[in-house]
Swiss-Prot record:
Origin organism lineage: Bacteria, Pseudomonadati, Pseudomonadota, Gammaproteobacteria, Lysobacterales
Name of this chain's protein: YcgL domain-containing protein XCV4171
PANTHER family (alphabetical): PROTEIN YCGL
Gene3D superfamilies, alphabetized: YcgL domain
SUPFAM superfamilies associated with the record: YcgL-like (SSF160191)
Positions of the YcgL domain: 1-83
Pfam families the record matches: YcgL
Domain of life: Bacteria
Amino acid sequence: MHAYVYKSQRKQDTFVYLATRDDFSGLPAAVQAQLAPLTFVLDVALTPERRLAQADAATVREALGKHGFYLQLPKTIVLAGECDHD
């Protein structure tokens, strides 16, 4: 299975993987509105051996098969002193 990866120009470190290149029809309108414009960055074969930087390839394949897209959000980093310890 191939995935076509697009980077959000609005939200840093946010990527959309599509099952079909340039087919944003399965992406909810609210998500498109938050992330657009999206710029194509990569065509990747999602083989079982494939390692992705921030996502599990099997999870991406499953989402592409079910929904036609996978949304990769940036990792949240909590810095010391920024969280409330009760």
